[in-house]
Swiss-Prot record:
Name of the protein: 2,3-bisphosphoglycerate-independent phosphoglycerate mutase
Primary enzyme class: isomerase
Transcription regulation as UniProt keyword: no
Annotated binding of Mn(2+) 1, by residue: D403, H407, H463
Gene expressing this chain: gpmI
Functional summary from the UniProt entry: Catalyzes the interconversion of 2-phosphoglycerate and 3-phosphoglycerate.
């Protein structure tokens, strides 16, 4: 007969941040006798769930995807934006073999280096600092013909904010004594993601043929003309930038084309127009055989060079459990099921050996303020049964309420959501203690603790950059360590289970057994 297992349970209360101020704080306002007692009587600490500590830009609020990747990886996982910032800062970017190789090949053949991307400080799809670094790389590596094709933002930035960015690049090219802005067009055309190929075609023709609806001597003049036509940045029509006497920047076979967007979804369509031999989105007037480089991998089936391939995570918590012949369960509602499976496993879709999954359907309501408890009762029932089954070495569970109801901005509903969670935590803690298991309670980021924006007085529906609680429930005598972050959770669990921590995990245990 197999011995009943005493599980190590991780409960993630999504959107359950820690904030001292009581005003507009749904977590403070709710009646939470169970969490209050655990915080008062059990080993606990606060951990960081935002900004650089989770691989995001400094002070940027956390999110569920990033949070769960860090929780499962046991190391800080840098997001593309931050990864590139770090690479540029330490100059590794300038030695990137794919980028440098494309520039050298074009330069040695007397060809042009074309750089395209969303010229924006928004940091969502791209960052203009990365594009500036690419211009510098091309110049440093001896390229003479450097053409920048600027896609204008106005969605992740104010609607008319491109002028300062374009000025900066025109000044840079003047200082270098070579290169220029060769075209401008709104992201509405160049970055479609809904197969509106008539839009993409306008951007493609602008790039390949150096033909557009409008022409201007300078990028700033072209932008000002667009504003005079009542076009905001996002909708600027295809504009060729070419002063008298300048050669046109039409693309030729053998040119290098480097796409500086790091986010994939709005980069795929125009990339396929250049790369796919069997492309049929529109009839291309000119097919050019360029040396196309994607900054990151936009899709696995796009066969062209990638400067920064996806970093595969080795020995995440789930993989390490499987390698050590441990059994594990992942359980949540629909809203956060992908987070405790795909994201917690470091972007791996398939379950590991010994990994079971339970999906509880989230309620079918228009918005979750209408049913703030969501499906927490059913989720708790299934979770408690799994804890008592003796089948699992470890269980990962996410309760979505704090986040999903927090997003509605309805304070009364968020309070009810938090109160429902308190009852759930009580049941789970009792079950864990009844079988001699261990329980960690934490969150992936904040939300419900800030329900009103103090600056505007409007409902606050976004995540926060505040810390989140971490509580230990179990029979071990442990001491909490301060200064932790989400990537310390997996090593903490392994340490409490008496298991070796793989060397890839750089996080540190936050509860030390005394």
């Amino acid at each position: 007969m197999s011995v009943s297992k005493k599980p190590m349970v991780l409960v993630i209360l999504d959107g359950y941040g820690y904030r001292e101020e009581q005003q507009d704080n749904a977590i403070f306002s709710a009646k939470t006798p169970v969490m209050d007692a655990l915080w008062a009587n059990r080993p606990h600490t606060l951990i960081d769930a935002s900004g650089l500590e989770v691989g995001l830009p400094d002070r940027q609020m956390g999110n569920s995807e990033v949070g769960h990747v860090n929780l499962g990886a046991g190391r800080i996982v840098y997001q593309d934006l931050t990864r590139l910032d770090v690479e540029i800062k330490d100059r590794a970017f300038f030695a990137n073999p794919v980028l440098a190789g494309a520039v050298h090949k074009a330069k040695n053949a007397g060809k042009a280096v074309h750089i395209m991307g969303l010229l924006s400080a928004g940091g969502v799809h791209s960052h203009e600092d990365h594009i500036m670094a690419m211009v510098e790389l091309a110049a440093e590596r001896g390229a003479e013909k450097i053409y920048l094709h600027a896609f204008l933002d106005g969605r992740d930035t104010p609607p008319r904010s491109a002028e300062s960015s374009l000025k900066k690049f025109e000044e840079k090219f003047a200082a270098l004594g070579k290169g220029r802005v060769a075209s401008i067009i709104g992201r509405y055309y160049a970055m479609d993601r809904d197969n509106r190929w008539d839009r993409v075609e306008k951007a493609y023709d602008l790039l390949t043929l150096a033909q557009g609806e409008f022409q201007a001597d300078t990028a700033v003049a072209g932008l000002q003309a667009a504003y005079a036509r009542d076009e905001n940045d996002e909708f600027v029509k295809a504009t060729v930038i070419r002063a008298e006497g300048q050669p046109d920047a039409a693309m030729e076979d053998g040119d290098a084309l480097i796409f500086m967007n790091f986010r994939a979804d709005r980069a795929r369509e125009i990339t396929r127009a250049f790369v796919n031999a069997d492309f049929d989105g529109f009839a291309r007037k000119k097919v050019v055989n360029v040396d196309f480089v994607m900054l990151t991998e936009y899709a696995a089936d796009i066969k062209t060079a990638v400067a920064y391939p996806p970093a595969s995570l080795v020995n995440t918590f789930g993989e390490w459990m499987a390698k050590n012949d441990k059994t594990q369960l992942r359980i949540s509602e629909t809203e956060k099921y992908a987070h405790v499976t795909f994201f917690f496993n470091g972007g791996v879709e398939e379950s590991f050996k010994g990994e079971d999954r339970i999906l509880i359907n989230s309620p079918k309501v228009a918005t979750y303020d209408l049913q703030p408890e969501m499906s927490s009762a059913e989720l708790t029932e299934k979770l408690v049964a799994a804890i008592k089954s003796g089948k699992y070495d470890t269980i990962i569970c996410n309760y979505p309420n704090g986040d999903m109801v927090g997003h509605t901005g309805v304070m009364e509903a968020a309070v009810k959501a938090v109160e429902a969670l308190d009852h759930c935590v009580e049941e789970v803690a009792k079950a864990v203690e009844s079988v001699g298991g261990q329980l960690l309670i934490t969150a992936d980021h904040g939300n419900a603790e800030q329900m009103r924006d103090p600056a505007t007085g409007q409902a606050h529906t976004a995540h926060t950059n505040l810390p989140v609680p971490l509580i230990y429930v179990g029979d071990k005598n442990v001491k909490a360590v301060a200064g932790g972050k989400l990537s310390d959770i997996a090593p903490t669990m392994l340490s409490l289970m008496g298991m070796e921590i793989p060397q890839e995990m750089t996080g540190k245990p936050l509860f030390i057994v005394e």
